[in-house]
């Protein structure tokens, strides 16, 4: 009986942490309660916290655990469906939302989710049906068109992206104004030409005494991107930047965010670098806002062109043959070499397994070895011994990755060999975290950290353009 009472106290602490949006603390409290007594409610509470913490794989496992105790527990099916939906797996989500409706016919939210999933499945099937394998890439057939007669914003002159244009474009975006379709397409086609020439993993040379800044996820938080440049200086040939993926989704200024980054890549192709993140892919863009945003601001054809450009992004970078920078992390095999990473075909949507998937989706863990990913994808989390082995085998000194919110904007793990950097402060307008970036100087290559807080942005809330939300 004492165990049950203690579990209830821990559950209440978990509920309190959840109400304060402290998802990981809530997970810890529910876990301690589950160690004392296993109930479907506790497993479902933890599943919901895991969904909020973007750990749908863990949420699926907890929903199944709840159903193992009580096979008709409707809330478990609901969380299971929500986890599948967050992964873009609409058919599996539909199956589980139907279970909820069967068990709770009056649940109007589940009924709405059933209809949403059916609609998305029809839409995706239609889009797949009209695409043919032999169809020429859109980048080869799209027309620039003429500039609108009533357009009075900044223009690309003489087919050249200049500093003056980029600065004017940034200010235009800051005022919530869009640039003409002609110039969007021009930038996308130009940046694609540059990216397609890159290997999967790009080597960056920073001369002795010069610097490079590494930023993590920015997730459509355009006004925070402007603040990074205010704090750290605009990109220049003498002020290098590397943005480590997840430029879009969630934040509702993803178009402005990615266009600014792409314009700088065109302006400084050898001094400004971009890595692909797990959100530079179709399934995430459909769920988390970028498709809806681009379609509303321009049209569906423009989104297709963005998708093609995303498929050209490099997977990672190596700075001065010392620092390995990739969005997610390391691999399911200790034998992976830098040469191995250059071989997979990256010019496609993000695969569900293999080296590219692992590069973009994996996470570090404190314990040695490997464990299944809590994100619900076919990759593993990796321990300090895995990091040590990879770095030693490839004559590297440090892993820098992103992909996870950190309260201080960064976290040093694995005995100083693994650093996570996240550059979207107050993520989704609710997490209260700081953002951070890292500066490295050629020569000593020791990381120096800058943290910063969020700045105000106009009225569009995160997920404004997303479909299927609130999911949970």
Swiss-Prot record:
According to UniProt, the reaction catalysed is:
O-phospho-L-seryl-[protein] + H2O = L-seryl-[protein] + phosphate; O-phospho-L-threonyl-[protein] + H2O = L-threonyl-[protein] + phosphate
Return the EC number.
3.1.3.16
Recorded protein name is Serine/threonine-protein phosphatase T
- State the needed cofactors, names only: Mg(2+); Mn(2+)
User: Which pairs of positions does the record mark as disulfide bonds?
Assistant: none
Q: How is its activity regulated?
A: Activated by arachidonic acid.
What InterPro entries does this protein's entry cite?
A: Calcineurin-like_PHP_ApaH, Metallo-depent_PP-like, PP5_C, PPP_dom, PPP_phosphatase, Ser/Thr-sp_prot-phosphatase, TPR-like_helical_dom_sf, TPR_rpt
Where in or outside the cell it occurs: the entry states: Cytoplasm, Cytosol; Nucleus
Residues recorded as binding Mn(2+) 2, renumbered to this chain, are: 246, 278, 327, 403
Which GO cellular component terms, listed alphabetically, does the Swiss-Prot or TrEMBL entry include?
Answer: cytoplasm; cytosol; nucleus
Q: Does the keyword Hydrolase apply?
A: yes
Name the active site residues.
Answer: 279
Major enzyme class: hydrolase
Q: Which parts of the chain are TPR repeats?
A: 7-40, 41-73, 74-107
Q: Output the Gene Ontology terms for molecular function.
A: metal ion binding; phosphatase activity; protein serine/threonine phosphatase activity
Residues annotated to bind Mn(2+) 1: 217, 219, 246
Note how many cofactor molecules are bound and how.
Binds 2 Mg(2+) or Mn(2+) cations per subunit.
Recite the lineage of the species: Eukaryota, Discoba, Euglenozoa, Kinetoplastea, Metakinetoplastina
The UniProt keyword set, sorted, is:
Cytoplasm, Hydrolase, Manganese, Metal-binding, Nucleus, Protein phosphatase, Repeat, TPR repeat
Give the function comment from the record.
Answer: May function as a protein phosphatase.
Domain characteristics, as noted in the entry: The TPR repeats mediate protein-protein interactions with substrate proteins, but also autoinhibit PPT1 phosphatase activity.
**Does the keyword section mention Hydrolase?**
yes
Highest rank taxon of the organism: Eukaryota
The entry assigns this protein to a family as follows: Belongs to the PPP phosphatase family. PP-5 (PP-T) subfamily.
């Amino acid at each position: 009986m004492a165990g049950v009472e203690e579990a209830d106290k821990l559950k209440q602490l978990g509920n309190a942490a959840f109400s304060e949006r402290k998802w990981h603390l809530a997970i810890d409290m529910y876990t301690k309660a589950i160690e004392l007594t296993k109930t479907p409610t506790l497993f479902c509470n933890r599943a919901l916290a895991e969904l909020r913490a973007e750990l749908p794989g863990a949420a699926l496992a907890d929903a199944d655990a709840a159903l193992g105790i009580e096979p008709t527990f409707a809330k478990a099916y609901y969380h299971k469906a929500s986890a599948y939906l967050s992964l873009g797996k609409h058919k599996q989500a539909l199956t589980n939302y139907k279970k909820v409706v069967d068990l709770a016919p009056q649940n109007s939210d589940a009924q709405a989710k059933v209809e949403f999933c059916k609609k998305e499945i029809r839409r995706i099937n239609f889009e797949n049906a009209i695409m043919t394998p032999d169809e020429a890439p859109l980048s080869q057939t799209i027309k620039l068109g003429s500039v609108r007669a009533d357009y009075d914003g900044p223009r690309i002159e003489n087919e050249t992206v200049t500093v003056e244009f980029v600065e004017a474009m940034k200010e235009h975006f800051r005022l919530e104004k869009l640039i003409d379709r002609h110039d969007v397409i021009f930038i996308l086609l130009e940046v694609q030409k540059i990216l397609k020439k890159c290997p999967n993993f790009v080597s960056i040379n920073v001369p002795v005494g010069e610097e490079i800044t590494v930023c993590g996820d920015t997730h459509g938080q355009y006004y925070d991107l402007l603040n990074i440049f205010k704090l750290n200086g605009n990109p220049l040939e003498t002020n290098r930047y590397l943005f480590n993926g997840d430029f879009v989704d969630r934040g509702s200024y993803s178009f402005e965010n990615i266009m600014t980054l792409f314009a700088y890549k065109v302006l400084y192709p050898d001094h400004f670098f971009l890595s692909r993140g797990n959100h530079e892919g179709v399934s995430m863009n459909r769920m988390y806002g970028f498709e809806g945003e681009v379609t509303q601001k321009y049209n569906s054809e423009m989104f297709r062109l963005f998708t093609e450009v995303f498929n050209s992004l490099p997977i990672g970078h190596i700075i001065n043959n010392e620092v390995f920078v990739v969005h997610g992390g390391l691999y399911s095999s200790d034998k992976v070499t830098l040469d191995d990473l250059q071989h997979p075909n990256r010019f496609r949507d993000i695969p569900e397994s293999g080296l590219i998937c692992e590069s973009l989706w994996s996470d570090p863990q404190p314990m040695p070895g490997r464990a299944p990913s809590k994100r619900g994808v076919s990759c593993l989390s990796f321990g300090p011994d895995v990091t040590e082995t990879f770095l030693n085998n490839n004559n590297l000194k440090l892993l820098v990755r992103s992909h996870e919110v950190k309260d201080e904007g960064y976290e040093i793990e694995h005995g100083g060999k693994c650093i996570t950097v996240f550059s979207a402060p107050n993520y989704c307008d609710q997490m209260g975290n700081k953002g951070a970036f890292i500066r490295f100087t050629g020569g000593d290559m020791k990381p120096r950290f800058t943290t910063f807080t969020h700045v105000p942005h106009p009225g569009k809330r995160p997920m404004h353009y997303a479909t299927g939300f609130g999911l949970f």
